[in-house]
């Protein structure tokens, strides 16, 4: 019983760390876009309430992405269902940006934001894929060393 509880706790903690990482990453990307838009308009201060909305929105969407959409940005490959998951998340961000009036409901800027978020999701997908290849190669190297009896860590 103790092991099963400990394993469940580890799994939950691991999931929460992944969610935290992604929510912060996507929130930061949204804030960068928002701040660039402000700078282009000659505004040199950001609305803190908007920044809070961006963080909360990122957390909610990442939870949806993680638990309901199969975590599409960490897939091995981008099939139709994963692409639809990414598109769903991007559309949620775009709708929320319009709803919360982050970009003054400017349709051109909102469309740019949609394209920007698609590119962010694709970059995160590629980065995760590259990291998996690196991790796999490292584990294979460690396994080879272990089999030879040459482990040096």
Regions found by a protein language model. Name each.
Residues 17, 21-29, 49-53, 80-88, ...:
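Alpha-helical transmembrane segments of integral membrane proteins
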Residues 62-67, 122-129, 148-152:
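Juxtamembrane membrane-interface segments at transmembrane alpha-helix termini
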Residues 68-74, 102-105, 126-138:
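A cytosolic-side transmembrane-helix exit/cap motif
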Residues 135-153:
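Short, highly charged, low-complexity non-transmembrane loops/tails of multi-pass membrane proteins
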Residues 1-41:
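N-terminal signal-anchor transmembrane alpha-helix
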Residues 84-113, 117-130:
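C-terminal halves and exits of single transmembrane alpha-helices
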Residues 38-101:
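The feature represents the first ordered module of a protein
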């Amino acid at each position: 019983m103790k092991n099963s509880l400990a394993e469940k706790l580890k799994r939950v903690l691991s999931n929460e760390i992944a969610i935290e990482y992604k929510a912060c990453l996507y929130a930061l990307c949204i804030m960068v876009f928002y701040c660039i838009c402000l700078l282009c308009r000659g505004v040199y201060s950001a609305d803190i309430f908007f920044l809070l909305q961006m963080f909360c929105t990122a957390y909610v969407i990442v939870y949806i992405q993680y638990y309901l959409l199969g975590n599409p940005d960490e897939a091995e490959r981008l099939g139709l269902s994963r692409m639809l998951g990414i598109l769903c998340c991007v559309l949620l961000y775009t709708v929320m940006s319009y709803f919360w009036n982050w970009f003054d409901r400017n349709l051109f800027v909102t469309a740019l934001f949609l394209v920007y978020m698609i590119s962010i999701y694709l970059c995160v997908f590629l980065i995760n894929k590259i990291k998996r290849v690196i991790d796999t190669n490292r584990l294979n190297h460690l396994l080879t060393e272990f089999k030879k009896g040459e482990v040096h860590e």
